[in-house]
Amino acid sequence: MSSLVFTLSVDDGHPLDLRIAEILARHRLRASFYLPIRNAEGAPVMTAAQARELSRYAEIGSHTLDHCFLTRVDDNEAWRQISEGKTELEQRLGHAVSGFCYPGGQFHARHVHMVRRAGFGYARTINNLYSDTGEQRFTLPTSLQFYPHKRDVLIRNFISQGAYKRRWSALQAIIAEDNWLMRIYRLFDHLEQHGQVFHLWCHALDIERLQLWKELDYFLGFVARRIPPGRRLDNSGLIRDRRRDVALVFPDHQKVV
């Protein structure tokens, strides 16, 4: 069977995250869910009871206090969002959280230091077209978003996110495909042959708004048929796997941080 590692990230803490968790449970897959306490953009966020229920089945990470884009606030507010978001989430769950996700994928180097200082073990970005865990554990990248992006969005993100040599083969594998969903399948097939990690991410609100539940369910079933149980990880597991077996998910010539 495949040696590829699969992980799924779900952002924003919408109550419909619980529906994604049900699909994951049916296919015996693992995932990491990143929850703010509130969402300043007005989207609903699951209650404390719902968050505790979700934590029985999946890893829960922080997404700041108010789903705050850190690059849009001063350093004092950024620190408050990071540190208090962690504290309040842990109080709701009754246990520590290790993971953090930068809202909107927006952060500067000083925010990475704040996340470390707050006591997180890793942080995730929305940088895409990666087949490994990136350069260090506080800028964990992804492979693709489960969303009908047009081709020009992929190209624009490729240009803006750098690391071109590292991401070029993934872009080549999918860029000729017009159908966004087929791009995800094609990238999976490509990484199964040439990569180490397939890291999918999504928002439950997008899945609901675009009525993509059937497509998500079918793709996750496809993954479950291809990926053995030991290669189905949440992001904390991915970081542990990265530390334990550097050769699996991190190039030999680079430093593990």
Task: Place the predicted regions along the sequence by residue.
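A conserved mid-domain beta-alpha-beta active-site/ligand-binding segment of alpha/beta enzyme cores
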Residues: 143-186, 192
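Catalytic-core region of carbohydrate-active enzymes that cleave or remodel glycosidic bonds
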Residues: 118-125, 185-192
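Metal-dependent polysaccharide deacetylase catalytic core of the NodB/CE4 family, i.e.
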Residues: 27-113, 117, 121, 128-146, ...
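Active-site beta->alpha N-cap acidic-glycine motif
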Residues: 1-59, 66, 81, 88, ...
